[in-house]
């Protein structure tokens, strides 16, 4: 497997980081510190960094300030959200779940949802990225009753 790196950008000028290889170790403490030190965190209500990206899957570390909201959206893939710090509220059209440190939520594709930070929060978003047109079990809002 070819190793893939993310090149430095104006957002993250301190060099490249490993994005994909046969095995990738991810230092969440280091990435959490990094996103809290970046200009985006200081000047907006959120910041995020992709810590792994390969065909079919992406892992993103997301930081939200208290009361920051990711407005209603859908994702064409399965997702999991795992809270590292803080507390978030995830709301679909029919259900809500408050998650704290050590708690997770899994959500099927194309379910409209939003995320609200009840406290300053850090969480991992893992998502599949190749479901479009695939024959997977389809769920929609009515299945969430």
Role assignments for model-derived ranges:
Residues 1-56, 140-145:
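A short, N-terminal "cap"/entry segment at the start of jelly-roll beta-barrel domains
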Residues 3, 26, 118-145:
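Double-stranded beta-helix
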Residues 43-45, 58-75:
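Conserved short histidine dyad/triad with adjacent acidic residue
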Residues 55, 84-85, 100-101, 119:
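A cytosolic small-molecule/anion-sensing beta-strand core signal
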Residues 66, 76-89, 93:
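Glycine- and acidic-residue-biased ligand/ion/polar-headgroup-sensing regions
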Residues 70-72, 90-91, 107, 112-118:
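Short beta-strand His + acidic residue motifs that chelate non-heme Fe in jelly-roll/DSBH
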Residues 93-109:
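Short acidic-glycine-tyrosine-enriched beta hairpin
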């Amino acid at each position: 497997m070819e190793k893939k790196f993310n090149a430095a950008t104006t957002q993250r000028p301190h060099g490249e980081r490993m994005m994909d290889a046969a095995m990738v170790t991810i230092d969440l403490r280091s990435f959490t510190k990094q996103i809290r030190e970046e200009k985006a965190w200081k000047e907006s209500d959120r910041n995020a960094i992709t810590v792994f990206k390969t065909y079919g899957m992406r892992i993103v570390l997301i930081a939200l300030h208290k009361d920051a909201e990711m407005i209603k959206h859908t994702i064409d893939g399965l997702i999991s959200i795992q809270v590292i710090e803080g507390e978030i509220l995830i709301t679909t059209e029919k259900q809500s779940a408050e998650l704290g440190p050590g708690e997770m939520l899994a959500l099927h594709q194309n379910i409209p949802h939003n995320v609200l930070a009840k406290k300053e929060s850090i969480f991992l978003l893992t998502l599949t990225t190749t479901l479009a047109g695939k024959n997977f079990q389809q769920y929609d809002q009515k299945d969430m009753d």
